[in-house]
């Protein structure tokens, strides 16, 4: 048995373990997964560091570098999402805000500290020289409620969440994660393990990654995967397909490489997530992706 903390229940990228378990792929590799869903990467990472879970799915890259630089027992076992086009920021349809430039003095949402959304809004502020107030709002459902009730000016979400509201013109998108130049085409979220777990149960972690890779293949090659996903979330298969095909090219969730590491390490200092650049030795210890 492996215990997992997973940020954002229902995002396509965070659903690999759930879909793989439901499809019997992890079982085939002799694994049972206990999956706990969190409000965001900050919470996921905390659970891994404290040892209350073995692995964390979708930990924000900046949060991971920050925790590791402060001596936290965290290791990277894979890339979880590369590119940030799935994340979007939105306002109520009748909001005067048309773009990020209109957010001075307004509240701009992210999920939790150290998450990919936190990294991206921090980058927005720097890149566009904004004076918005960054506000942690947890997951997409609570964030939408806050936007619709005018507690927050700009909310965040990722499909399939919010697609209905966008279609019904209740909300409109003002930015996506790719509008943050430092995150475009980079690995933004990671698969992480507690350092102790990786040391003492490496063969189990290796098996998890084998099953994970097999599930990613299944999610794009087998039409059954959309059925499993849509039944779990109680959404239509059409919406499941739109989520996958519109926002997640397969390459974006293949776990084999951390893309843009050199830039990420520099940006972590720029955006004040680490005090100094991590060295090659440190990165060698932090990043231990099991080979295919």
Where do the language-model regions lie?
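Pocket-lining segment of extracytoplasmic ligand-binding domains
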Residues: 141-231
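Short, glycine-/small- and polar/acidic-enriched structural segments
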Residues: 1-137, 141, 146-149, 153-159, ...
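Short, solvent-exposed loop/beta-turn-alpha elements that line the ligand-binding surface or hinge
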Residues: 25-28, 179-184, 249-258
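Predominant activation on well-ordered alpha-helical scaffold segments within soluble catalytic domains
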Residues: 18, 65, 122, 163, ...
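Conserved C-terminal helix/tail region of periplasmic/extracytoplasmic solute-binding proteins
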Residues: 266-292
